[in-house]
Amino acid sequence: MKTEIKFDFEMVMGVVEYTRRLRFGGQKFSRAIMIEKAIEKTSKNLTYVGLDDTLGHDFTTKVNGEIWRLEAKGADHLFQTDRTFNTVKITLKNFQGNVNNNFPEKKFDEMILIDQTQRHIGIVSFEDALKNFDPKKNLKKSGLKIVVDKRDVEYIAKNVSLAPKNQVKELYHEIVDELYKWEDESDEW
């Protein structure tokens, strides 16, 4: 791991738990943004850029004077507990029908992996995340799905406790207010 990841794991896992009801269909996108914003708000060194879809990563930080790009991915039971060495399938990119057979362009340097049920957080390099990439297996019309070999993951937190609910609730409402702030104070349309 080249990046030192600094954010409040307990607060972020609290937001993961607090937003659990948003894990179906179109709500997943909103939940991901909430979790990513929680990482940003509790981070000492990560800048959130995830709302710009053209970038292909969620955070930036500086490592030895250069910009380092990080992608965040989370799922229930991400680090499966059965005998497999792989994570569950992770959607890396949604092509929405536009699939090419080339190796994915490098849009991030490291990936933050969040297991939302076991409450583990790990990090893996782009190269290790895609080392088993096979266009025939991984590219579908719905997007690019990968599995990461868990032996390549550096765990930065395991069995994370939840922050006190009142603190998590306060952070959650701060994020909602920021994301959905009503800009116009006038009563006129």
Label each PLM-derived region with a short phrase.
Residues 1-189:
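Nucleic-acid endonuclease domains
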